[in-house]
Amino acid sequence: MNGLNHNALTCSAVPIPPWERSLQTVEAQPYFNVSQASLVLEGIVFDRNNNLLFVDVATGRVFKLTPERQLSIVLKENSFGASGLAVHKDGRIFIASVGDMQRGSVRAIEPNGTREQMIVAPDTGFLVNDLVFDNQGGFYFTDSRGNSADPQGGVFYVSPNVGSIHAILPGLAVGNGIAIDPVGSQIWATEHAKNRLHRVRLSDATTVAPFG
């Protein structure tokens, strides 16, 4: 009796599904070696000068890599931790943090790492994982609270004047990554504990569109 026949496409521990094998692909290549140590790097975003910014999750450090591939540390001391970055239209760097997994925050620093300002304080109770700005200067962030059986997280919006926080997509099981389209009419957010990607259509910055 003949056994099952496998090839390079099917013998992997995580084979590519048949309906995805004909999609166009590109293989990623190493770009820059940040460290010989094993670091968890996240929050990749470009600033206004085409520098690549990212964080070391374990230490909360914020790195900058120039187009010439010169690496420097923008923020060396960060007891709050870091999990995501976004750049305000005025150039400030906003840092998302889950903190000690009990009290997260959003803080802003100048491009050179100085003048730290608290935007979303730890006592608000959010575990801020990631964030993204809209065209008005407000930002959406994901909240990583909860688990698959107790979805306490979600997507929230902070107004441009940082005067209020609005719930946009509550009830997520560990909100994670977030992105927005160029005109601010749709956001995408991942729900880590349930392996879901949500697309949300918006009527305005704080209102989900009908059937959105």
Residue spans of the language-model regions?
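A short, charged helix-loop
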Residues: 153-167
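Beta-rich, blade/repeat-based domains predominating
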Residues: 34-49, 77-105, 122-141, 146-147, ...
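A short loop-to-beta-strand structural motif that recurs across blades of beta-propeller domains
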Residues: 61-63, 104-107, 153-156, 196-198
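Short loop/turn segments that connect beta-strands within beta-propeller blades
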Residues: 65-70, 109-114, 159-163, 201-206
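Beta-propeller domains
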Residues: 49-77
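A short beta-strand motif characteristic of beta-propeller blades
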Residues: 27-34, 69-76, 114-122, 163-170, ...
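Anionic-ligand binding region
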Residues: 193-212
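A short helix->beta-strand "capping" segment at the edge of beta-propeller domains
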Residues: 11-38, 67-69
